[in-house]
């Protein structure tokens, strides 16, 4: 008995002695990596974290040092070099991708991830790097670096062995093998199939592919689930998923876009939207324990095939013993540890099925056709912290009542994902020519299982006009007047320069031209929400056009003195400009638009001439220039009248103005005069709001000829463009396009 007690005491003393020796060594030389093999549950996943400490010296102060898992202590700038960080992530996470991960259900054999670290390094570079000799720290110098490295790797090891990460890595590997088997099986012995046209032989090639929008849906789903499961390890999860999806150059801001709580996908018809959601939902349920998925569509008949598809997939992969269901309403998948995941199905006609639920993912299929009251129920899930809503719908925009998702296109690019096969630069050509079906730059490619040619397009449009663009290509709705496409005209750089750069004309009168050009676009209305009178006064500043005055005038009431009031507005603005620039201008060329009313245009011209004469007689101006008016001869008449008829000059006038504006040749004076724009509003910014509404519409003409027009009324057709029209026409008339001989004084 005493021998047994002596042996036990000796053993305990020996253990304590060796522990003291180990602590002394660790304090002197740093912590050594544990050679203990991984447990069965860890599998090869744990081996990925058993990367030994590399003893190499760096000449960097401690404040600029950073410990990178799997490598060691380096300068912290290395973390921000895309090439280095991507390679480091590959070297670290390649072992995780080749492991079997957390096997939560039996009878599932996952195919190893094929990866080689040497694939990223050329043989020549590898040979050159191998010949480099690195200076090593002494044991005492290496101790703090070894301890820091061990601490980082221990944290990384705890992350890699967590149940949540095991589920995430298992999901990515299973989905990878789904693609390998064309979405038929997640087992190594699964049957082969290929989603392709039936008349195209596959020649033994069974590997499937993902469309870009399908990969985007997968990334949105995976990133959001990982942020919910592994919120404390968000940085490491992002690195892992960058490696999984092969997106090393994706920035952190873009990754946040994948984690947002709602996203919208507008995809053309027959492209595999619902077809892709079935295996995605099934695999999410079979991998993530406790997850709750919701699926809703516009009618019950649309939810039933999805319900049956998910149920059959789960039973095919894992057996019927793990799957329980309530016909057409819910599916429950059970795990071996007693946990389970659920999926709930409902149509927009019965939203009570999703009320009161606690979803992590809510898929809204054919969302453009969801009933309005159901939309309110769905949007209510945005208030849930751990729920993401994914709207998926076709690009049907034929009816305003079924296009509420497409109306989001101007609100946020991060929210809306529109799938199309024609880029914005080439969309006008596709819309103008009836045989074009794809983008001529080949940047956007159509799937192999889509038949898209000129004959198909003409056939589709024979059944219903514009059906090709709206239903098949996923483009924009055509204008009622013909084939059309609108796009902004002014560049962002030119617009910012126009707002910020305003030279002083008062201090630089010597370089100003001696001629002022005035254009008046009259409007006889007292409704401030309708069109008003636009007045623009411009001149030359060296080779540039400079704006001296802008007026947007609305009548207080419709009376017999309306023409006189408009004339007074123009005269007052002109008088202020002449007072600010004494002895500078010798001629003023005035153009009064007479398209709406020639009599009123003549009356405005007379009012301006009379009121300007009053200023001259009152000695208000130090020197009065000569006032000349544009004169037109109406058809069938031999007398010239002081008004300007705007006919086909508008398109070339806008072309000239846009070219000069984007070249920086249209500027505003620092002493710009505006008596009608509110004091709290900058007249230049007020003008820019109207310039932003100017769009070009390209229409298909006879044969292959395109015609273009311009509109400044905005998408609703109700925006004001009076000030913009006055400015554009004043610049155009002041150019050499119109001779000075048409300007004459009023006699």
Swiss-Prot record:
GO terms for cellular component: host cell nucleus. GO terms for biological process: chromosome organization. GO terms for molecular function: DNA binding; hydrolase activity. Its main location: host cell. Belongs to the herpesviridae TRM3 protein family. Interacts with the terminase subunits TRM1 and TRM2. Interacts with portal protein. This is Tripartite terminase subunit 3.
